[in-house]
């Protein structure tokens, strides 16, 4: 049985696609998860959630209450399309407006943590000016988040600007704000030439959640668990020994699979077995 001190969640994109959150949370509960992480990506469909009516927001809150499965975090990857570091003022303004709406949405439905994508720009060429604009955009975003009491947490990315906890800590020190923290992805962290254990230890005190996935160098998505380079047992041991007691989120993109629930159940069992070996949970 999963320890109550270690919440285990599943990414929305691992579960069947659709807009019925009651069904999604019921399935997550059946699969043994404590929470689901919402995705607001660069697609128009998921971006439109930020414009939900009061009734739509209330339906999500009611689904959470009915199922007991929380939605405590949002993966906000929409800034790939509307980056805060864009040299196009109109695009950057859209990025800041998305941030404002996301923070308001989080405040309305009880989301505590918004995971940020650490891209100054994604589809354009980066330079000193895009990085400066990105820093300024983060500063403005954290000011908004502070007023709303919503935490912004930087993901460790598949992108050189933010591919280590050490680099993300630089932004945390620059912003010097308790509402800006870190949300490492042990898959992304392992795919680069990082000393993963040292990086995880360096982040303790700033880590608010952890993404769990497997990766290979240069391959950051859809690597089956056990086929990549991540030393899960060592990562879990390091986090446990360092005093981290927060949530873990299995990140998968199986929403279009033939049987998403079966894929998720298989991954859940695999991850929990590694957690048990690390002394984090009881063996199944």
Curated annotation (Swiss-Prot):
Pathway(s) this gene product operates in, as recorded in its UniProt entry: Cofactor degradation; L-ascorbate degradation; D-xylulose 5-phosphate from L-ascorbate: step 3/4
Q: Is Isomerase among this UniProt entry's keywords?
A: yes
**GO MF assignments:** intramolecular oxidoreductase activity, interconverting aldoses and ketoses; L-ribulose-5-phosphate 3-epimerase activity
Annotated signal peptide: none
| SUPFAM superfamilies, A to Z | Xylose isomerase-like
Q: Does the keyword Phosphoprotein apply?
A: no
Q: List the EC numbers from the record.
A: 5.1.3.22
Q: What class of enzyme is it?
A: isomerase
Tell me which UniProt keywords the record has, alphabetically: Isomerase
Q: Induction of this protein: by what?
A: Induced by L-ascorbate. Repressed by UlaR.
The record lists the catalysed reaction(s) as: L-ribulose 5-phosphate = L-xylulose 5-phosphate
Question: Which terms does the UniProt entry file under GO BP?
Answer: L-ascorbic acid catabolic process
Q: Which InterPro entries does this UniProt record tie to the protein?
A: L-Ru-5P_3-Epase, L-Ru-5P_3-Epase_Enterobacteria, Sugar_Epim/Isomerase, Xyl_isomerase-like_sf, Xyl_isomerase-like_TIM-brl
Q: Which NCBIfam families match?
A: hxl6Piso_put (TIGR00542), PRK13209.1 (NF009688), PRK13210.1 (NF009689)
Q: What does this protein do?
A: Catalyzes the isomerization of L-xylulose-5-phosphate to L-ribulose-5-phosphate. Is involved in the anaerobic L-ascorbate utilization.
Give the family per the record: Belongs to the L-ribulose-5-phosphate 3-epimerase family.
Record's protein name: L-ribulose-5-phosphate 3-epimerase UlaE
**Which organism encodes this protein?**
Escherichia coli O8 (strain IAI1)
Provide the taxonomic classification: Bacteria, Pseudomonadati, Pseudomonadota, Gammaproteobacteria, Enterobacterales
């Amino acid at each position: 049985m999963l320890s109550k001190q270690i919440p285990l969640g599943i990414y929305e994109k691992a579960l069947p696609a659709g807009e019925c959150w009651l069904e999604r949370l019921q399935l997550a509960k059946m699969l043994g998860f404590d929470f689901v992480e919402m995705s607001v990506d660069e697609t128009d469909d998921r971006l439109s959630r930020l414009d939900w009516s009061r009734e739509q927001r209330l339906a999500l809150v009611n689904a959470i209450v009915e199922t007991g499965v929380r939605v405590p975090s949002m993966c906000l990857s929409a800034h790939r399309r509307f980056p805060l570091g864009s040299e196009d003022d109109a695009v950057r303004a859209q990025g800041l407006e998305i941030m404002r709406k996301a923070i308001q949405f989080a405040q309305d439905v009880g989301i505590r943590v918004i995971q940020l994508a650490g891209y100054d720009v994604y589809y354009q060429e980066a330079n000193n000016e895009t990085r400066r604009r990105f820093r300024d955009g983060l500063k403005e975003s954290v000011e908004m988040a502070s007023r709303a009491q919503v935490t912004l947490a930087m993901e460790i990315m598949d992108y050189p600007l933010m591919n280590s906890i050490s680099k993300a800590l630089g932004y945390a020190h620059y912003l010097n704000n308790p509402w800006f923290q870190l949300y490492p992805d042990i898959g992304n962290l392992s795919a680069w030439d990082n000393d993963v254990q040292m990086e995880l230890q360096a982040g303790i005190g700033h880590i608010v959640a952890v993404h769990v996935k497997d990766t290979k160098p240069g391959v950051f998505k859809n690597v089956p668990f056990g086929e990549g380079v991540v030393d899960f047992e060592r990562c879990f041991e390091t986090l446990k020994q360092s005093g981290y007691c927060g949530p873990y989120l299995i990140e998968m993109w199986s929403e279009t699979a033939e049987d998403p629930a079966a894929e998720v159940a298989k991954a859940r069992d695999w991850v929990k077995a590694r957690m048990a070996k690390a002394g984090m949970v009881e063996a199944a």
